[in-house]
Amino acid sequence: MATNFSDIVKQGYVKMKSRKLGIYRRCWLVFRKSSSKGPQRLEKYPDEKSVCLRGCPKVTEISNVKCVTRLPKETKRQAVAIIFTDDSARTFTCDSELEAEEWYKTLSVECLGSRLNDISLGEPDLLAPGVQCEQTDRFNVFLLPCPNLDVYGECKLQITHENIYLWDIHNPRVKLVSWPLCSLRRYGRDATRFTFEAGRMCDAGEGLYTFQTQEGEQIYQRVHSATLAIAEQHKRVLLEMEKNVRLLNKGTEHYSYPCTPTTMLPRSAYWHHITGSQNIAEASSYAGEGYGAAQASSETDLLNRFILLKPKPSQGDSSEAKTPSQ
């Protein structure tokens, strides 16, 4: 995990073509890779000092790139062009042919990724297509220090149908830590953060984990969708177990309800809607108390807006299933 991570891939003086006037003006160009601070982009400053003074640059987000190309020498010497899928372009010239070639190769690798088979850039990309596709499903986050973990900093976060994974920012094959979705007690987001609280059913241990990110809403929606899918699956298991018990006890006076499956359940805000058929009275009681509190809570509260609802725990799980204090 990178604690001293820098998102600057390349920078230097170039002459960039103005979109309005079509003339080339000298500027300090900074190419930043995607990170917890923002997407992949070009930042144009008047000079190098403006970067140190944290001036406000003109930003071009580098997404939906069709190709990166070198302009013919008879058209413009030492020039590089980024062509986007909407056929717009950003063109700049460099002070030397060597510098132009370096910009071209860097932009090609960072912007085109797996589409470099026809570009002679040295060693081939060793990542399999499946692994490369997987990279697009990872989010840029910065894990804030927490007592449970000895790692923090810039990393990649991935959500699957069962787990949340953290991957090393420099080596996409190195997994740093994981949390089962069923161990989440609550989760939330705001404009710059995604936060969740995990229980004891994970290797990292229980605790609150906070990530600085510009993609908090997308991460939240992924986690919430996966959590609801687990809840739906659990509901189907309960219904099937209840059906089997009814068949076994058919014709007898004694009726026993099925036991709750041993799998721990995610405690999302909508849990009681899905498991309400298991115990209508209990779900109604939770809903009456929970929703009143939820509606009274502030929209800006990152965690307290989420209701901690779960099915009634078995006696053996009573110590684990206690709702954490707010």
Curated annotation (Swiss-Prot):
Motif DKFBH motif location, chain numbering: 265-275
Tree of life domain: Eukaryota
The tissues where this chain's protein is expressed are given as:
Widely expressed. High expression in skeletal muscle, heart, kidney and liver. Weaker expression in spleen, lung and small intestine, brain, heart and. Expressed in both resting and activated peripheral blood T-cells.
Alphabetical list of CDD domains matching this protein: PH_DOK4_DOK5_DOK6, PTB_DOK4_DOK5_DOK6
The record's section on InterPro entries has: Docking_Protein_DOK, DOK4/5/6_PH, IRS_PTB, PH-like_dom_sf, PH_domain
Q: Where is the PH domain?
A: 7-112
Where the record annotates domain IRS-type PTB, the positions are 132-237
Q: Which GO terms describe its biological process?
A: cell surface receptor protein tyrosine kinase signaling pathway; nervous system development; positive regulation of MAPK cascade
Query: Which Pfam family is one of those matched by this entry?
Result: PH
Per the entry, what this protein does is: DOK proteins are enzymatically inert adaptor or scaffolding proteins. They provide a docking platform for the assembly of multimolecular signaling complexes. DOK4 functions in RET-mediated neurite outgrowth and plays a positive role in activation of the MAP kinase pathway. Putative link with downstream effectors of RET in neuronal differentiation. May be involved in the regulation of the immune response induced by T-cells.
Q: Which PANTHER family match?
A: DOCKING PROTEIN 4, DOCKING PROTEIN RELATED
Q: How does it assemble?
A: Interacts with RET and TEK/TIE2. Interaction with RET is mediated through the PTB domain and requires phosphorylation of RET 'Tyr-1062'.
Any domain commentary? PTB domain mediates receptor interaction.
Protein name from the UniProt record: Docking protein 4
The species is Homo sapiens
Taxonomy, top ranks, is: Eukaryota, Metazoa, Chordata, Craniata, Vertebrata
Q: Which gene encodes it?
A: DOK4
